[in-house]
Amino acid sequence: MPRKGPAPKRPLVLDPVYGSPLVTQLINKILVDGKKSTAERIVYGALEGAREKSGGDPVAALKKAMENIKPSLEVKSRRVGGATYQVPVEVKPGRATALALRWLVGYSKARREKTMTERLRNEILDACNGLGAAVKRREDTHKMAEANRAFAHYRW
């Protein structure tokens, strides 16, 4: 087995419009089949729509939405004896951001609006206000961790 350790993280190229690493990560998460310009058009359109609807800085709205979506706890399966327990563990910051982006994009795709730009804009605005499916997913994750608090001593 190789003993070099994990590969170093590659630096993130910031997006040209907002210069925000979060916007870059969102673009990369929406990216399908390598069509970066399409992904950029969707994200920038959604952020412009968010600016028009909320009247504020769209990147600040996205950051607020991400804070409302990011989980602080999750459950991981742990096998002890013959039983499998759902053990609550804290979520590392990088994973919390990745999960939040995954949920934001996933629940945006599931919405009923006509274009992906509209769906993403409305999901961001809903999450900003503490509403929406992505925020509900975070609450469900926290509820699950709270319900399995008795197994917290199985942490590793």
From Swiss-Prot:
GO BP, sorted A to Z: translation
Family annotation (NCBIfam families): rpsG_bact
Function, as annotated: One of the primary rRNA binding proteins, it binds directly to 16S rRNA where it nucleates assembly of the head domain of the 30S subunit. Is located at the subunit interface close to the decoding center, probably blocks exit of the E-site tRNA.
Gene source species: Renibacterium salmoninarum (strain ATCC 33209 / DSM 20767 / JCM 11484 / NBRC 15589 / NCIMB 2235)
Gene Ontology cellular-component terms listed: small ribosomal subunit
Name of the protein in question: Small ribosomal subunit protein uS7
UniProt KW tRNA-binding keyword: yes
One term of GO molecular function: structural constituent of ribosome
Binding partners and assembly: Part of the 30S ribosomal subunit. Contacts proteins S9 and S11.
InterPro entries in alphabetical order: Ribosomal_uS7, Ribosomal_uS7_bac/org-type, Ribosomal_uS7_CS, Ribosomal_uS7_dom, Ribosomal_uS7_dom_sf
Alphabetical list of CDD domains matching this protein: uS7_Bacteria
